[in-house]
Amino acid sequence: MEILEEKPKEGKIKIKAETLDDLWHLYHIISEGDVVYAKTLRKQAQRSDSLRPEKVEAVPVFLGIKAEKINLHRFANQLRITGPIIYASREDVPLGRYHTLTVEPGTVITIQKEKWKNYHIERLKEAIESSKKARVMIVAIEDGEAEIAIVREYGLDFVGSITYNISGKRYNIKRDDEEKKFFHEVAKSMEELMKRENIEKAIVAGPGFYKENFVNFLRENYPELAKKVVTDDTSMGGRTGIYEVIKRGTVDKVYTESRISKEIKLVEKVIEEIAKNGLVAYGLKEVEEATNYGAVETLIVLDSLLKGELREKIEELMELARNLRASVVVVSSEHEGGDKLKALGGIAALLRFKIK
């Protein structure tokens, strides 16, 4: 993500989205009531002459819409913002009509808020910093099956699954040929994804020697790809193997601690403290009380709470926690750490001292 222009007095920040992760960050930055400006296409009736009926054409226009619905469509690589038009660069575009702005990687938008809160500014900074980090791919491979995932800011993005029917006994010529075809297919998928997604490292994981055979194959046939690969031992292949890689902290060894790993560890720490009746509070009532006492060391909030009915209350609590020198972490609902936090009410806090 790139910030192109800031107008603090008007509450405007002009941004260029560059990746799917950026769209995810924008989904959490843009709130209902914000005004979003962007170039777009809008269907307009065009009268060619008095004898012919009107024809509808998509004309380019710069619009400002007041956001009412914000939806992230990950598989389409799009963020869609719907609301009434409050500004149009063309006089023939009626104000008040509804329009949907589609934001994709490469789109430039301007966001206008009545007040930019610390949470939103921190999120912007985080998006900019994360765009500088290398992306990581995980490939879990086991006897004719490969699962491919990209480690994104919000969690794991499972982007491919390859299954090949490899028959016969080991060291059989037919089996070896089938295995090579499978390895070629996995390698080509990896190359294509790494180029498209600008991925610099891949972790190849799996049980036994199968992954080593695959990496040796890469060294012989795809030497440039092999240079970007590290291996990890897991008990299983498939998605289970990929989750195992995350839990083992292998991604963190490839580059600085990933967001998903940090969030999962933090939620696990909360659960550990609950189990021993330690320095922890969970659920809105308990966390609010702990914050008011100044007892919160780290406030942990599920991102979906910031899109629901409690948004304003949660944002106020986050601001209060920051003012009392607590750190605030927003956890993605897209991974298992988010699922566990949701079961605790979507909000928890690690404490400096007990309040009860």
Curated annotation (Swiss-Prot):
<dbReference type="InterPro" id="IPR038069">
    <property type="entry name" value="Pelota/DOM34_N"/>
</dbReference>
<protein>
    <recommendedName>
        <fullName>Protein pelota homolog</fullName>
        <ecNumber>3.1.-.-</ecNumber>
    </recommendedName>
</protein>
<dbReference type="InterPro" id="IPR005140">
    <property type="entry name" value="eRF1_1_Pelota"/>
</dbReference>
<dbReference type="InterPro" id="IPR023521">
    <property type="entry name" value="Pelota_arc"/>
</dbReference>
<dbReference type="GO" id="GO:0070966">
    <property type="term" value="P:nuclear-transcribed mRNA catabolic process, no-go decay"/>
</dbReference>
<keyword id="KW-0540">Nuclease</keyword>
<dbReference type="Pfam" id="PF03465">
    <property type="entry name" value="eRF1_3"/>
</dbReference>
<keyword id="KW-0255">Endonuclease</keyword>
<dbReference type="Pfam" id="PF03463">
    <property type="entry name" value="eRF1_1"/>
</dbReference>
<dbReference type="GO" id="GO:0070481">
    <property type="term" value="P:nuclear-transcribed mRNA catabolic process, non-stop decay"/>
</dbReference>
<dbReference type="InterPro" id="IPR004405">
    <property type="entry name" value="Transl-rel_pelota"/>
</dbReference>
<keyword id="KW-0378">Hydrolase</keyword>
<dbReference type="GO" id="GO:0046872">
    <property type="term" value="F:metal ion binding"/>
</dbReference>
<dbReference type="GO" id="GO:0005737">
    <property type="term" value="C:cytoplasm"/>
</dbReference>
<dbReference type="InterPro" id="IPR005141">
    <property type="entry name" value="eRF1_2"/>
</dbReference>
<keyword id="KW-0479">Metal-binding</keyword>
<dbReference type="InterPro" id="IPR042226">
    <property type="entry name" value="eFR1_2_sf"/>
</dbReference>
<dbReference type="InterPro" id="IPR005142">
    <property type="entry name" value="eRF1_3"/>
</dbReference>
<keyword id="KW-0963">Cytoplasm</keyword>
<comment type="function">
    <text>May function in recognizing stalled ribosomes, interact with stem-loop structures in stalled mRNA molecules, and effect endonucleolytic cleavage of the mRNA. May play a role in the release non-functional ribosomes and degradation of damaged mRNAs. Has endoribonuclease activity.</text>
</comment>
<comment type="subunit">
    <text>Monomer.</text>
</comment>
<comment type="similarity">
    <text>Belongs to the eukaryotic release factor 1 family. Pelota subfamily.</text>
</comment>
<dbReference type="GO" id="GO:0004519">
    <property type="term" value="F:endonuclease activity"/>
</dbReference>
<dbReference type="Pfam" id="PF03464">
    <property type="entry name" value="eRF1_2"/>
</dbReference>
<dbReference type="GO" id="GO:0032790">
    <property type="term" value="P:ribosome disassembly"/>
</dbReference>
<dbReference type="GO" id="GO:0071025">
    <property type="term" value="P:RNA surveillance"/>
</dbReference>
<dbReference type="GO" id="GO:0070651">
    <property type="term" value="P:nonfunctional rRNA decay"/>
</dbReference>
<dbReference type="InterPro" id="IPR029064">
    <property type="entry name" value="Ribosomal_eL30-like_sf"/>
</dbReference>
